[in-house]
Structures are given as structure tokens and as C-alpha cells.
């Protein structure tokens, strides 16, 4: 397990510029599992790829600026702020799919279309807000395949409800009336929202970086919900994380 928390900015460790040109550069690469970045600012624009290579990675309360091919496709992004200076911040997400929870997207370029991915891959966006300076179309990817299914809930653009990928609506699953939402988002008896990062990141070793397992279990026991997705749906949503309280009782 590796955690990066409030990574300090030490100017004395900086290097003098070789010239005035701007080069793309990765913030960091890693080969490992169970990575957490909390309250870290990642600024590198093109090809940033913060902590790219992690099997499971949580970005919590992080700030990112990016152009294209710049975000980590295996990440769970919770309470993050992302500024898009390019139209396609992801190169790919098909290794497992990226998830955004309660995050803000600021479209900072002048184009009239914003996508998440350059390639075709799964994404989930829950309780997220787009902030735009002019009308912008937001889509999952530039040329989505017919088989692609991405998931959204509670998405807004400048405060108004918004459906991502309206050009091909069959690519988008709106989870407002779906049990699958509990794989990402739960509400306790007091109305408090619990983002199910335990379910998304637990893997085979019960990893729970934000210590929400007990809350997830209590919610499952309180209202008797044991969410099972039928086999036919699971086959079509093979990357979908499942919320199953019975496995943690």
C-alpha cells in the first residue's frame, strides 16, 4: 500500500528550465496495487498520467489539470476537481473502467465538444458537475462502439440535469431507478450519502482505504437490501462492480 498525502511543494528541489519550450511529462508511474493520493495537486497537462500503472488507485480530494491522454484509467476519483484543457483527458479505461464520485469538471478550452476517452472504454460518473463557459456537448468517447455501456447518476451541467453521450443514448445507462447504483452510492437511515469505495476497491484482500465497510454493512442489514444483478446483465456488464452486503456479514 502506498499513500501520498498533501505532497509538499519544495521549490529548492526544482530544476532550472533548459529552455522556454513546454514538454509533456508524466507526473509519476508506478507498478503496484492499493495506491491512495489524498489532497494532492497534479498539474502536467499532456500525458500527465498520475500514478499510472496501479491496479487499484483512489484519488481523494485531489486537483488535476490536464489536456489529452492525461488521466489514470484505473482510478476511482472521489471529491476531486478536474480542469480539462483538452477534449479527451483519457487515452483508455478498458482495463477496468474509471469511476468519478462527487467531482467537478471544468471545461477550460474553447471547443464545443468534450469527451472523456480517446479510445472506447467503460466509465461511471456519479454526483458530478460540469462547469462550462458556453454550451458544450459532453460525451463518453469520440467514436463510441454500439456495445459500450457507461453509467451515470446525478450529473449536471451548470446546475441543470445532463445526460452524457446523448448522440448515442443507448451507450448511457442512467441509474436513477436502478439497483446497480448501490455499487457506487448508498444512503443511510439519516439521509447521509456513503460512496461505496469499499465495494469498488476491495478486490480479493478486503481493502477499505476510507474505512466505509462498516457503514456499508449497517445499511445492508438495516433495510435488508442484498443486491444481486441477474446473470444476463452481468454478462453484458462484465466490468461492473457489485454491491453484495451478504459477503461482508
Model-derived features: where do they sit?
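Sequence-level preference for short, compositionally simple segments enriched
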Residues: 1-224
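Beta-solenoid repeat scaffold
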Residues: 1, 239-241
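N-terminal amphipathic/hydrophobic targeting modules at extreme N-termini
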Residues: 230, 235-239
Amino acid at each position: 500500500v502506498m499513500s501520498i498525502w498533501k505532497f509538499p511543494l519544495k521549490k529548492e528541489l526544482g530544476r532550472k528550465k533548459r529552455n522556454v519550450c513546454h514538454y509533456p511529462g508524466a507526473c509519476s508511474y508506478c507498478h503496484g496495487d492499493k495506491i491512495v493520493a489524498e489532497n494532492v495537486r497534479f498539474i502536467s497537462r499532456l500525458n500527465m498520467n498520475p500514478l499510472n500503472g496501479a491496479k487499484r488507485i483512489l484519488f481523494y480530494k485531489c486537483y488535476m489539470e490536464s489536456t489529452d491522454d492525461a488521466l489514470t484509467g484505473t482510478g476511482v476519483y472521489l471529491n476531486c476537481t478536474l480542469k480539462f484543457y483538452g477534449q479527451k483527458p483519457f487515452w483508455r479505461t478498458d482495463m477496468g473502467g474509471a469511476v468519478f464520485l462527487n467531482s467537478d469538471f471544468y471545461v477550460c478550452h474553447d471547443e464545443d465538444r468534450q469527451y472523456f476517452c480517446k479510445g472506447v472504454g467503460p466509465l461511471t460518473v456519479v454526483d458530478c458537475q460540469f462547469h462550462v463557459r458556453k454550451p458544450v456537448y459532453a460525451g463518453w468517447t469520440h467514436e463510441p462502439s454500439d456495445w459500450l455501456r457507461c453509467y451515470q447518476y446525478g450529473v449536471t451541467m451548470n446546475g441543470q440535469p445532463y445526460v452524457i453521450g446523448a448522440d448515442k443514448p443507448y451507450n448511457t445507462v442512467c441509474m436513477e431507478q436502478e439497483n446497480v447504483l448501490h455499487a457506487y452510492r448508498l444512503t443511510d437511515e439519516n439521509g447521509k450519502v456513503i460512496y461505496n469505495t469499499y465495494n469498488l476497491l476491495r478486490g480479493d484482500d478486503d481493502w477499505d482505504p476510507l474505512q466505509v465497510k462498516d457503514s456499508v454493512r449497517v445499511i445492508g442489514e438495516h433495510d435488508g437490501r442484498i443486491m444481486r444483478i441477474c446473470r444476463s446483465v452481468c454478462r453484458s456488464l462484465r466490468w461492473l462492480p457489485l454491491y453484495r452486503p451478504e459477503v461482508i456479514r
